A protein has these predicted regions:
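Metallo-beta-lactamase
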Residues: 1-102, 106-118, 124, 133-188, 206-213, 238, ...
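Metal-dependent catalytic neighborhoods of phosphoester/phosphodiester hydrolases
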Residues: 120-130, 260-262
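Short, basic/aromatic-enriched C-terminal tail that caps enzymatic domains
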Residues: 257-275
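Short, P/G- and charge-enriched loop/turn segments at secondary-structure junctions
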Residues: 44-49, 127-128, 186-187
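Residue-level marker for the onset of beta-strands and adjacent loop->beta junctions
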Residues: 1-3, 55-57, 128, 176, ...
């Protein structure tokens, strides 16, 4: 098991809860083997010569007695909720949260950066019906995500679950620029999808959680990725604004440790890396 990643920024504690690290083919992230091999700093943390690292993880934010889980395992629904696997993954995740000191019953808010998957926002009960996985939490999404979903919900496996939870009054929304907790601010970026939002921590900001703007740290070197983003130029422009200023970057889908600093055309592992 990888060492736990924890950051302290002012009165906020951020803790990464890792479910699994995996190696996957580059085309899953819109990359090629040539792209992977072009990144000099890929090994050993982020990629091999032929595959890149990814994770299923969740970030826990603790501030002033409140507990928020940010984008819990927001990918790979076809694996996490495969009917053939039953409740194996949800049961294992619930046990993991308990073991890591964050029982699901203690979470106040499930903060989702954009509507795309179910992840561990919800689970099927014994009757096969979808219910919130965090029983005492409100689900919070960017207002732009809610507006975009109401306008064009699409026809994806997650669509019906989101429709059910929204209609049941389980979902709240926040505006662009909203302060989630003192020292944590939302920024609507779009680019990946209409409501995609990143979150900044501290006054610098000292850290930025990127959501799916960079599915892998390799995307910080490989440039435009139209396979991942309907607005690749916009995504790349936003990412460029997060380099060379000393901030820590956090990626929810990145392999352990899931954080680093972008400086001088390289991505330096961890929060303590020199810049």
């Amino acid at each position: 098991m990888a060492e736990r990643t924890t950051l302290q920024i002012g009165g906020i504690t951020l803790t990464r809860v890792l479910y699994i690290d995996v190696m996957i083919p580059p085309e899953v992230a819109g990359l090629t083997i040539d792209d992977v091999q072009s990144v000099a700093w890929r090994a050993p943390e982020w990629a091999s010569d032929t595959e890149f690292g990814a994770s299923a993880s969740a970030w826990i934010i603790e501030s002033e007695g409140e507990r928020i889980v940010l984008d819990p395992l927001q990918a790979a629904d076809e694996v996490l909720h495969d009917p053939a696997a039953g409740s194996a993954h949800t049961d294992a995740f619930i046990e993991l949260m308990e073991r890591e000191g964050f029982p699901v019953e203690t979470i106040d808010t499930v903060l989702i950066s954009h509507i795309e998957t179910v992840g561990m926002m919800g689970r099927r009960d014994e009757a096969g019906e979808w219910v919130p996985l965090f029983p005492n939490a409100r689900i919070v999404i960017p207002r732009a995500s809610l507006v975009a979903f109401e306008r064009a919900p699409g026809d994806f496996p997650s669509t019906a679950v989101w429709r059910q939870f929204i209609d049941a009054g389980l979902v709240d929304s926040i505006d662009d620029g909203a302060e989630v907790v003192p020292g944590m601010r939302a920024e609507l970026t779009g680019a990946h999808n209409p409501g995609h939002t990143v979150f900044h921590f501290g006054s610098g900001p000292d850290a930025t959680w990127l959501g799916h703007l960079a599915v892998s740290p390799l995307h910080l070197a490989t440039g435009l990725c139209p396979q991942q983003h309907p607005e690749p130029e916009r995504a790349w422009e936003i990412l460029q604004g997060f380099r060379d200023d000393g901030r820590v970057l956090l990626g929810p889908l990145w392999p352990s440790p899931g954080i680093g600093r972008w400086h001088n055309d390289a991505f330096h592992v961890g929060a303590d890396s020199a810049v």
